[in-house]
């Protein structure tokens, strides 16, 4: 297979460790999924991979991005032999999930898709907004979800072209202009026939890191729906059960960045999540 564009990877250990769960995102938003996965699977080993060399994915031409992710996973699978792989990125999941399953049939893949079905089940007003990247908004897959599960609701798709980058800045402790955040989320709030939007689906794993900011800036209270917990439960359901006699993993959880150059703030963040480089 052609060498992945992100550079060389660590050599595969000579003594095979416990097969990890691989959590992949374009940046650090997938940590929201990792956090929930550890709650439901504290005995499992994780490898977190951020394709920061390719971030943000919204700037990519679709076929080029698809090729990149498929090639990267060839390296990831060869080096880490994951028990399961989680695409903790809505943009990547809606673009390439099925291609990954075809390319690597021996690895179970779990993807992130907008939580439109639970939003439709939970809404009282029937007014639901989906806050996502422009790539997720324009995919036919997203519209198919609406047609299948939310046809009786008024669903507004809101493509936020800069919110993931703002979330990354926020996680790093950097300042940002809250007016930009307000401009990104304002289209989510609809008033119609005396009713208001009551659920906003967070259809990007970066956005939950901003949820306290979003709550404060919102013109009225809504349910900010984060699918990370449901994805973690789905991951667990695909793995073989462990008995009480099974030993917990002894290997460290790892973080790998495709740029090979995470800055100091990111390294501190990863260490705070108990991830070793």
Curated annotation (Swiss-Prot):
Keyword Heme included in the entry's annotation: no
Any one GO molecular-function label of the UniProt entry: glutamate racemase activity
Keywords: Cell shape, Cell wall biogenesis/degradation, Isomerase, Peptidoglycan synthesis
EC annotation from Swiss-Prot or TrEMBL: 5.1.1.3
Pathway it works in: Cell wall biogenesis; peptidoglycan biosynthesis
Residues given in the record as substrate binding sites: 25-26, 57-58, 90-91, 205-206
HAMAP family on file: Glu_racemase
Task performed by this protein: Provides the (R)-glutamate required for cell wall biosynthesis.
GO biological process: one example: regulation of cell shape
Domain of life: Bacteria
This protein's encoding gene: murI
Active site: 89, 204
Species the sequence originates in: Brucella suis (strain ATCC 23445 / NCTC 10510)
A Pfam family reported for this protein in Swiss-Prot or TrEMBL: Asp_Glu_race
Protein name as annotated: Glutamate racemase
Alphabetized InterPro entries for the sequence: Asp/Glu/hydantoin_racemase, Asp/Glu_race, Asp/Glu_racemase_AS_1, Asp/Glu_racemase_AS_2, Glu_race
